[in-house]
Amino acid sequence: MTNAFNTSNSQAVFHAAQELMPGGVSSPVRAFKSVNGDPIVFDRVKGAYAWDLDGNRFIDYVGSWGPAICGHSHPEVIASLQEALEKGTSFGAPCELENKLAEMVIEAVPSVEMVRFVNSGTEACMAVLRLMRAFTGRDKLIKFEGCYHGHADMFLVKAGSGVATLGLPDSPGVPRSTTSNTLTAPYNDLEAVKNLFAENPDAIAGVILEPIVGNAGFIQPEPGFLEGLRELTKENGSLLVFDEVMTGFRISYGGAQGRFGVTPDLTTMGKVIGGGLPVGAYGGRKDIMSMVAPAGPMYQAGTLSGNPLAMTAGIKTLEILQQEGTYERLASITNRLINGICESAKQAGIPITGSSISGMFGFYLCEGPVRNFEEAKQTNSDYFGKLHRAMLAKGVYLAPSAFEAGFTSLAHSEEDIDSTLKAFNECFNELSQ
């Protein structure tokens, strides 16, 4: 990065964008409102780095919000895409590459016997909710406070992430009738889930959750929580759905369910399985997935679903992740990163709690533990905003929200971690004075 931290080109482009797009962005968190600043406008990305329009280089811990697990613009992924481009960008017809990626997903993810590709995580979660209801003949859904399952109406109830980032209540424009069948419970609270089942006998189609909450920061399941949900759903004739859009192929090759040894009935996926291109997927037990059209009566479709570019990038990304030592390396650098962040904060007298699993991490600027969204909201968001801006000036790009997980990649080097920890140490000391 340059000696003087200049973002004038980013500011000019963002100013112009505000006349063209709502808030100047295509997704709210990118506007930097949570950190009280103007966004950085990127020009290019490569490996562990991003460059803005002013030539500043940043060590990137957002990774396009999770997909860039191999690093940005991985040469093998780019080469595969260039070859695929010669054959066309979209067929709107069956594509042999769909078979290949489907086989890889089915082999890797314990719950998945059949899979359907879509274009986003939101789309996957919308479809899986319809499928839950179709299969069970029930209407109600249990979700957890702070878990985000996309921006579809029925999920915008205590949804964390973007809603928490903007400090807004659940979105206007969502009819009460749409969310009346959405029940909520605190994350890690099995007793609350038991009570909801007791209060709604034979009415709950299923329970959906992020097995690790990445859209309220980084909250891990307490021992027995996922296992308890598996038992409760079976006992009540309901389905268990893991939203692994963020954790799938990220915390282990088999996702959170592979890591924790708890197999849901259905799983939603995205991010990593598209290798940086727009993608989503949902899959699960064959008897449930057989209800999806055209095999069954539950309708779901998509113009660009299973397009050859997304399939190509996904296949190559998963092939890279299959290489020996991949997840051990991610765990090593990420563990060193979060431990160093927490140590620097504590030495500066700043309350902090943080943790990581594989290439995913998060921290809260408050005393721990943080087990649910209410406890996550105790984080010092004002301080985080100052920290975020200070880290940008030192060449480190963190998620512009205190309520988003961070990500490392195979491209991050030990030197990158060293530089990042040096910047954190300097920023904590400067801000504590």
Swiss-Prot record:
Named cofactor requirement(s): pyridoxal 5'-phosphate
Pathway, per record: Porphyrin-containing compound metabolism; protoporphyrin-IX biosynthesis; 5-aminolevulinate from L-glutamyl-tRNA(Glu): step 2/2; Porphyrin-containing compound metabolism; chlorophyll biosynthesis
Cellular component terms per the entry's GO annotation: cytoplasm
The keyword Protein biosynthesis is annotated on this UniProt entry: no
UniProt-listed GO biological process terms: chlorophyll biosynthetic process; protoporphyrinogen IX biosynthetic process
Entry GO MF terms: glutamate-1-semialdehyde 2,1-aminomutase activity; pyridoxal phosphate binding; transaminase activity
Keywords tagged on the record: Chlorophyll biosynthesis, Cytoplasm, Isomerase, Porphyrin biosynthesis, Pyridoxal phosphate
In-chain residues carrying the UniProt-annotated modification N6-(pyridoxal phosphate)lysine: K271
Reaction catalysed by this enzyme: (S)-4-amino-5-oxopentanoate = 5-aminolevulinate
Primary subcellular site in the record, as a coarse category: cytoplasm
Top EC class, one word: isomerase
Entry's transmembrane regions: none
PANTHER family, sorted: GLUTAMATE-1-SEMIALDEHYDE 2,1-AMINOMUTASE (PTHR43713), GLUTAMATE-1-SEMIALDEHYDE 2,1-AMINOMUTASE 1, CHLOROPLASTIC-RELATED (PTHR43713:SF3)
Assembly description: Homodimer.
Protein family: Belongs to the class-III pyridoxal-phosphate-dependent aminotransferase family. HemL subfamily.
Protein name listed in UniProt: Glutamate-1-semialdehyde 2,1-aminomutase
Organism of derivation: Prochlorococcus marinus (strain SARG / CCMP1375 / SS120)
Gene coding for it: hemL
